[in-house]
From Swiss-Prot:
Its cofactor is Ni(2+). This is Putative nickel-responsive regulator. Keywords: DNA-binding, Metal-binding, Nickel, Transcription, Transcription regulation. Binds 1 nickel ion per subunit. Gene3D superfamilies: ACT-like. Chain A, domain 2, Met repressor-like. One of its GO terms (biological process) is response to nickel cation. One of its GO terms (molecular function) is nickel cation binding. HAMAP family: NikR. Transcriptional regulator. It comes from Geobacter metallireducens (strain ATCC 53774 / DSM 7210 / GS-15). The lineage of its organism: Bacteria, Pseudomonadati, Thermodesulfobacteriota, Desulfuromonadia, Geobacterales. The keyword Transcription regulation applies. Belongs to the transcriptional regulatory CopG/NikR family. PANTHER family: NICKEL-RESPONSIVE REGULATOR. It comes from the Bacteria.
Length: 139
C-alpha cells in the first residue's frame, strides 16, 4: 500500500448530511473509509467496462423445476462453461421453485455473457448477476 495523502472535498451541506447518514447505516468508522470504498467501487466498475478485466461474480437464478426441460437446459449451459463456473449451489425453495447460485470467474465480458445466457433461458423466473473484483488490483 502507498503513502496516505490527505485532500479536501467541497460538498453541499445537504449531500454531506445524506452521506453521513449512509456512513452511519453502513457502519463506517469515518468519512475517509467511506470515500475510499466509493473510489474503489468506481475504479472496479470502470475496469469492467473494457470487458478484459479478470473478475468473479455470482449468478442467481430462480426457476420452477417442473417447467419442461428447463433443468436440463440450465445444466447444459453450465457444463458448456465448466472452466468459468467454479461452484454451484442448488436450493429447493418449495415444492416447485429452485434457487441456483453459481460462482463464475473470468474476463468481465465472458462472465456477463454467461450470466445473460443463463438468465435468458426460457422459464427462468428471475436472475441476477453480481460482479465483484478478484481483489488483486485493489489497495
Amino acid at each position: 500500500m502507498g503513502e496516505t495523502v490527505r485532500f479536501g472535498i467541497s460538498i453541499d451541506d445537504k449531500l454531506l448530511e445524506s452521506f453521513d447518514r449512509l456512513i452511519e447505516q453502513k457502519g463506517y468508522m469515518n468519512r475517509s473509509e467511506a470515500v475510499r470504498d466509493l473510489i474503489r467501487a468506481a475504479l472496479v466498475e470502470l475496469k469492467w467496462e473494457g470487458g478484459e478485466e479478470e473478475t468473479v461474480g455470482t449468478v442467481t437464478l430462480v426457476y420452477n423445476h417442473h417447467v419442461r426441460d428447463l433443468s436440463d437446459k440450465l445444466t447444459e449451459q453450465q457444463h458448456s462453461h465448466h472452466n468459468e463456473i467454479v461452484s454451484a449451489l442448488h436450493v429447493h425453495l418449495d415444492a416447485h421453485n429452485c434457487l441456483e447460485v453459481l460462482v463464475v470467474r473470468g474476463k468481465a465480458r465472458e462472465v456477463k455473457k454467461i450470466a445473460d445466457e443463463l438468465i435468458g433461458v426460457k422459464g427462468v423466473k428471475h436472475g441476477k448477476l453480481v460482479m465483484t473484483t478478484t481483489g488483486e488490483e485493489l489497495h
